Curated annotation (Swiss-Prot):
Positions annotated as active site in the UniProt record: 243, 277
Protein name: N-succinylglutamate 5-semialdehyde dehydrogenase
PROSITE patterns: ALDEHYDE_DEHYDR_CYS, ALDEHYDE_DEHYDR_GLU
Originating species: Shewanella pealeana (strain ATCC 700345 / ANG-SQ1)
Disulphide connectivity of cysteines: none
Family annotation (CDD domains): ALDH_SGSD_AstD (cd07095)
Gene: astD
Length: 486
């Protein structure tokens, strides 16, 4: 019983699917997919529940959301372990994800009041009142890299605003989604307010195409996001929020503490086995002795990165990629870059057949003319040597994406120069570019999104503004308009 529809756990009626631990290939979850017909039932359940959920009022909705927060707190160790087993990420990292899920509640409440909520002002024309109302039924598509935290960042603000939700998680991380819904159930969520449909492409297509959803919130690949954007292009009445990937640049310029710089480069490129949408994919290092020395330190440090299963002791820095298929894809990406003229400074290798375990890779692609503008979603960092700061910024901007970017530089003037010219929604200075605050918006431009930043700004796409001019009774104005006699 792995579909949660109208407040009940039911069996999927589609084909059988399994979820495996990518570090050892053990099956940790199996069930059947939701059929398009079951997706329709889930949407109907959300539609039937939506008005009553909205009319409960914010305080009553908040009480249930806070009860969910308490369930997360009580079960955070289990949540972290399930995420670790299903994604292959090491336990230290999934503990931070479980913690972020808890922290998202307070941030979402603050965002609701600051970004939406209700306000009023007296004007000569009457009382001007600004309110926000929910869109209705929204679909949430979750990714596999942060299977708890990222969909949580859509679901919580959507519910606070008064929407109901149909949640379709990644088919690679169904067990995390199942645990999330069990905690919502324990929190006392009314039936139909969240509905979980587990499945693969057929399930997702049925949900995205359903005429009764009022919005879709997606986190995932640029390819899928662009398909959804095309699908919704002729339907302006539906809100679409896309958070996609990036081919993210990191520039190094005149840094005295090279050891700290190497640390921030590694945290930017290799955390989560390179499976964060904000991970650095391109590293720009100045030509000359200083750049040579930094690269030498980086090569040595990358070779020392510990890789291992989610539960290895002592804990590794990098766990498994999400699947053996993903691991093989990174080996192939490296091979393609070498064939184009790249030089592997540290070779990315598939460490164990049948698993997603790979070693981190570092490849010098300086001078490669036809460098693909691709998001290689794994631990492979491309190095480009530059002679001129303007050249480095120009190369950094030479991408259709625009999610994250950063510079490590001791000079504030260099940062200001970079900040004014770089094209990205997240721009960091002397910090890893995978570091983002839930108290700030999260999103990018270009192929990285559709101008619907998430995190603190998720409240913006979960409700629409309603402007009213009000008076307690009808009354004649002191002076009638010319030409009127009443």
């Amino acid at each position: 019983m792995t579909q949660f529809i109208e407040g009940k756990w039911v069996e999927g009626l589609g084909h059988e699917v399994t979820s495996i631990n990518p570090a050892n290939q053990k099956v940790i979850w199996n069930s059947k997919t939701a059929t398009p017909e079951q997706v329709g039932v889930a949407v109907d359940a959300a539609r039937n529940a939506q008005f009553d959920w909205f009319m409960l009022g914010f305080d009553a909705r908040l009480a249930i959301v806070e009860a969910y927060r308490d369930q997360l707190e009580a079960n955070k160790a289990e949540m972290a372990e399930v995420i670790a087993q299903e994604t292959g990420k090491p336990q230290w990292e999934t503990a931070t994800e479980a913690g972020a899920m808890i922290g998202k509640i307070g941030l979402s409440v603050a965002a609701y009041h600051k970004r939406t909520g209700t306000s009023e002002n007296d004007t000569p024309a009457g009382r001007a009142v600004l309110r926000h109302k929910p869109h209705g039924v929204v679909a949430v598509f979750g990714p596999y890299n942060f299977p708890g935290h990222l969909p949580n960042g859509h679901i919580v603000p959507a519910l606070l605003a008064g929407n109901t939700v149909v949640f379709k998680p990644s088919e690679l991380t169904p067990k995390v989604a199942e645990l999330m819904l069990k905690l919502w159930e324990k929190a006392g969520l009314p039936k139909g307010v969240i509905n979980l449909v587990q499945g693969e492409v057929e399930t997702g297509k049925a949900l995205a195409a359903h005429p009764q959803i009022d919005g879709l919130f997606f986190t995932g690949s640029s390819r899928t996001g662009h398909i959804l954007h095309q699908q919704y292009a002729g339907d302006p009445g539906k809100i679409l929020a896309l958070e996609m990937g990036g081919n993210n640049p990191l520039i190094i310029k005149d840094v005295a503490d090279t050891k700290a710089a190497v640390h921030d480069i590694i945290q930017s490129a290799y955390i989560s086995a390179g499976q964060r949408c904000t991970c650095a994919r391109r590293l720009y290092v100045e030509k000359g002795a200083a750049g040579d020395a930094l690269l030498e330190q980086l090569v040595a440090a990358v070779k020392q990165i510990q890789v291992g299963p989610w539960n290895a002791q002592p804990q590794p820095f990098m766990g498994s990629m999400i699947s053996e298929t993903a691991a093989k894809g990174m080996v192939e990406a490296q091979r393609n870059l070498v064939n184009l003229g790249g030089n592997a400074l540290v070779e990315l290798t598939h460490l164990e057949v049948g698993t997603g375990l790979v070693s981190p890779g570092l490849i010098d692609v300086t001078g490669v003319i036809e460098l693909p503008d691709e998001e290689y979603f794994g631990p492979l960092l491309q190095v480009v040597r530059y002679s001129d700061f303007d050249e480095a910024i120009k190369l950094a901007n030479a991408t259709r994406y625009g999610l994250s970017a950063g510079i490590l530089a001791d000079s504030r003037e260099d940062y200001d120069y970079f900040l004014a010219r770089i094209r990205a929604g997240i721009v960091n200075w002397n910090k890893q570019i995978t570091g983002a605050s839930g108290a700030a918006p999260f999103g990018g431009v270009g192929a990285s999104g559709n101008h619907r930043a998430s995190a603190f700004y998720a409240a913006d796409y979960c409700a629409y503004p309603v402007a009213s001019v009000e008076a307690d009774a009808v009354s004649l104005p002191a002076t009638l308009s010319p030409g009127l006699s009443i």
